[in-house]
């Protein structure tokens, strides 16, 4: 692809970014032949480090087809960074506003102009504990079905070893290897010409994410979980646990019955710190013995007090 199509701003950004990337990361790049030489297309890439957009852009820059990333709109207002984002043709994503659909329209326009739009279908850094791709959002599938452009699934691994997701400090040494595998375009033919329902978009997205995950398995030499991490499912589960804990505390404060954890089974009961059954169940032998000992101690103390009073009266 002629350099004039890359543009001055992208070439200037490459001059700044490539030297530190070359120093930090060795390269194991495969599948460049699957990047289309002409025409608009989408790359769908997994996201596991704050620096992997730069590492991945380095890979695709070397193919001659530079990516246009969808990025948070706030980055476009940050001085030099914002100027570079605008100059290199990145696409702002406005969230929770009337402009939320503008990124979708801009992505379609870019593809129809013959450019590459790079999607991180997960929408954010993976939260999977082992770094596997999460469930994806439907933006890439929506643009692909609207334009019928090729979708190239890309897996990457290595930038996360320099700067793990949600980590505070980078791990610069020893030098890590950035591994990239770009696969052949995903076959989405069976989705064309059908009504673009949420169910259809979800199914197409699952096909794209499955292709990314297969390539990452090949890179890592490991098997991914059978069910991908689902942030929405985890949020629902966390809210459920929070509600249960809040209800348990309220019942405990009000003197009402408190059931133990469900996994203990209906026949088992949780006891308080003093050994009192929390749900009104029949007291066990340990609790009864403790109460008996307490009554005996109280009787001894009462006897001593009475003896002391009698001694005082007789003095």
Per-range role (PLM):
Residues 130-199, 203, 226-257:
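A cross-family acyltransferase "interaction/gating" segment
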Residues 108-140:
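Catalytic-site beta-strand/loop segments enriched in glycine and acidic/polar residues
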Residues 59, 84, 109, 142-146:
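Hydrophobic/aromatic ligand-binding patch that stacks against planar heteroaromatic rings
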Residues 6-25, 82, 86:
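Short hydrophobic helices that act as membrane-entry/anchoring signals
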Residues 22-29, 100-101, 162-164:
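Short gly/ser/thr-rich secondary-structure transition/capping motifs
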Residues 22, 36-97:
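Catalytic core of membrane glycerolipid acyltransferases/transacylases, capturing the structured
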Residues 268-315:
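Long, low-complexity, intrinsically disordered segments
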């Amino acid at each position: 692809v002629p350099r004039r199509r890359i543009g001055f701003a992208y070439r200037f950004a490459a001059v700044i970014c490539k030297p530190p990337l070359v120093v930090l990361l060795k390269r194991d790049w495969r599948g460049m032949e699957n990047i289309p030489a002409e025409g608009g297309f989408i790359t769908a890439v997994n996201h596991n480090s704050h620096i992997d957009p730069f590492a991945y852009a380095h890979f695709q820059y070397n193919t001659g087809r530079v990516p246009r990333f969808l990025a948070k709109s706030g980055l476009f207002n940050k001085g030099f960074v914002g100027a570079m984002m605008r100059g290199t043709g990145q696409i702002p994503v406005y969230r929770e506003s009337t402009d939320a659909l503008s990124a979708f329209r801009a992505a379609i326009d870019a593809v129809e102009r013959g450019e590459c739009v790079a999607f991180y279908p997960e929408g954010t850094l993976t939260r999977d504990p082992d770094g596997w791709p999460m469930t994806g959002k439907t933006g890439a599938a929506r643009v692909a079905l609207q334009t019928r452009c090729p979708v190239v699934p890309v897996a990457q691994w290595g930038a996360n070893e320099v700067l793990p997701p949600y980590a505070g400090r980078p791990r610069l040494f020893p030098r890590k290897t950035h591994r990239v595998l770009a696969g052949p375009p995903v076959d989405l033919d069976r989705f064309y010409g059908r009504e673009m329902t949420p169910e259809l978009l979800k199914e197409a997205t699952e096909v794209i994410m499955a292709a990314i995950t297969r390539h990452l398995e090949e890179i890592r030499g490991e098997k991914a979980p059978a069910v991908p991490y689902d942030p929405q499912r985890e949020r629902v589960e966390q809210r459920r646990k929070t509600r249960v804990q809040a209800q348990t505390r309220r019942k405990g404060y009000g003197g009402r019955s408190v059931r133990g954890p469900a996994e203990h089974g209906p026949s088992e009961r949780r006891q308080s710190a003093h050994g009192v059954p929390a749900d009104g169940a029949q007291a066990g032998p340990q609790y009864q013995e403790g109460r008996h000992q307490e009554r005996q101690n109280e009787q001894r103390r009462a006897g001593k007090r009475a003896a002391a009073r009698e001694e005082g009266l007789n003095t």
